[in-house]
Amino acid sequence: MNQNGSQIHSDGNGHSDDTDTPGVSAGQVSVNTAGVDDLLDEIDGLLESNAEEFVRSYVQKGGQ
């Protein structure tokens, strides 16, 4: 135990259990942005081919 009475466990490689692993969350972010990028590419393609129909469809669905 340390001075304040709590325990910190180590994995033997100098890493303690109470630290966050930055690499894990960074990997999740790239997976999420890949889906968003695909959606944006699809919207861009639709706008290039028929912007007027896209706007009409958006307004009919309740957009402003």
Curated annotation (Swiss-Prot):
PTM note: Is modified by deamidation of its C-terminal glutamine to glutamate by the deamidase Dop, a prerequisite to the subsequent pupylation process.
InterPro entries: Ubiquitin-like_Pup
Key words of the record: Isopeptide bond, Ubl conjugation pathway
BP GO annotations: modification-dependent protein catabolic process; proteasomal protein catabolic process; protein pupylation
Cross-link (Isoglutamyl lysine isopeptide (Gln-Lys) (interchain with K-? in acceptor proteins)): Q64
Molecular function per GO: proteasome binding; protein tag activity
Extent of the signal sequence: none
Residues with Deamidated glutamine modification: Q64
Quaternary structure, from the entry: Strongly interacts with the proteasome-associated ATPase ARC through a hydrophobic interface; the interacting region of Pup lies in its C-terminal half. There is one Pup binding site per ARC hexamer ring.
Record remark: domains: The N-terminal unstructured half of Pup provides a signal required to initiate unfolding and degradation by the proteasome but is not needed for pupylation, while the C-terminal helical half of Pup interacts with ARC to target proteins to the proteasome.
Function text: Protein modifier that is covalently attached to lysine residues of substrate proteins, thereby targeting them for proteasomal degradation. The tagging system is termed pupylation.
Record-given protein name: Prokaryotic ubiquitin-like protein Pup
Provenance organism: Corynebacterium diphtheriae (strain ATCC 700971 / NCTC 13129 / Biotype gravis)
Name of the gene this protein is made from: pup
